[in-house]
Amino acid sequence: MEEFQGYLKKDRSLQQHFLYPLLLQEYIYTLAHDDSLNGSIFYEPIEFIGYDNKFSLVLVKRLITRMYQQNFLIYLVNDSNQNRFGGHTNYFYSHFFYSKMVSKGFSVIVEIPFSLRLVSSSEEKEIPKSQNLGSIHSIFPFLEDKLSHLNNVSDILIPHPIHFEILVQILQCWIQDVPSLHLLRFFLHKYQNLNKTIQSNKTIYVFSKENKRLFWFLYNSYVSECEFLLVFFHKQSCYLRSTSSGAFLERSHFYGKMEHIIIVCCNNFQKTLWPVKDPLIHYVRYQGKAILASRGTHLLMKKWRYYFVNFWQYYFHFWSQPYRMHINSLLNYSFYFMGYLLRVLINPYAVKNQMLENSFLIDTVIKKFDTIIPIIPLIGSLSKAKFCTFSGHPISKPIWADFSDFDIIDRFGRICRNLSHYHNGSSKKQSLYRIKYILRLSCARTLACKHKSTARALLQRLGSGLLEEFFTEEEQVLSFIFPKTTLFTLHGSHRERIWSLDIIRINDLVNN
């Protein structure tokens, strides 16, 4: 990141308004293809057979010129159909490589205004640098502290824009370079037309994987716009004076005001925003899923859902189904978020109160934030990865049988340690032990398949040596902190939650 900021200091005052010339700078493509600077966790390199992937700025200039020709898309598709089974160097893949190069370089360029704004904002506010602030596990201590005091929660699936032009219009507020916006439109429509025109499923898959960094940047810009306006409206509604409850008695008057909720005018905030006035509301989002929790009533959450549906319809010009927002009470509802099932438990207690010679019992309840590992989705992810059946029965992975014994054990152990590291925040570890058992037995059967033996004979020969590969660092540390607790049993019951603040992305098996 420091190297990235060093390049951004060049002509810093001109970059926001003149981004297009940066496409012809070689260091832009160096940044785009540097794995250490690639912030996308979905980055997957694509290899081209028969092409040496050499880079030339002269060919990039020619490609940009040719891309604006009307027959470029038709020629590209026809050439791919002619050379699909050719044994020589494929001209289509060479052009695809340069198109991929330009699009990835363009991804770096459009991020420059946002990177500069983020750096300048952190410098003005003097925000201390901390890796813990970037951990996705930092969300769970926040939920643990807040959800137990709230009443209702709304589980939101953020809809995707149905038209690319909406994404371009969002960026127009931050990027004033017109040629860059035109090039962005061309990229988006090219991808859309190729997916509709090319009939090969393999080619569609390659193009869908071509530049996830650009598409995730556009999607995050869209979500950022939604959240910016949400925070703005919420702040404005909090400044309004209280509305008399008498207005709720007349239903026609109530719905009359609800119809004007999407009209935003500085002089009319009191009319438009009072139905969603809620000073105590919490919003958490990860990727395309968000949580809106409040201490208010169920009716208030319905108003927020009404507001969201109308907001997406009138501001982003697409319809979002109301069922994408599930409203439930926190006391009897479990919702899935970031690989966990979250819920609020009520533990009743009887407290004995002694006053002089009289004593009496006081019934009270304590709300507790509970986190559970969803075993069924995890087993489904393991079955898709060919570690077990859909019922959770461990099976061998023959595709790994060609590796050495050390590589096989290391692969299984790394998957197991990563899952344990991510799910150590669970209050109950039985599901985690079952996942470990599946991976351990799948590893044994893979080794047995390689050596033409049985899993039972292999486990008897290896003993506990294979089991040690599946122990996590957290368990070894806890063995010193809690020496009286048996941590390595499959049927243990441990309730110590450990949130790891070094996790910056969700595990692929968890996210399926």
UniProtKB/Swiss-Prot annotation:
Compartments it resides in: Plastid, Chloroplast
RNA-binding found in the keyword field: yes
Coiled coil: none
InterPro entries: Domain_X (IPR024937), Maturase_MatK (IPR002866), Maturase_MatK_N (IPR024942)
Gene Ontology CC terms: chloroplast
tRNA processing in keyword set: yes
Keywords assigned by UniProt, alphabetized: Chloroplast, mRNA processing, Plastid, RNA-binding, tRNA processing
GO biological process, alphabetically ordered: mRNA processing; RNA splicing; tRNA processing
GO function term, MF aspect, one: RNA binding
Main location: plastid
Role: Usually encoded in the trnK tRNA gene intron. Probably assists in splicing its own and other chloroplast group II introns.
Protein family according to the UniProt entry: Belongs to the intron maturase 2 family. MatK subfamily.
Name of this chain's protein: Maturase K
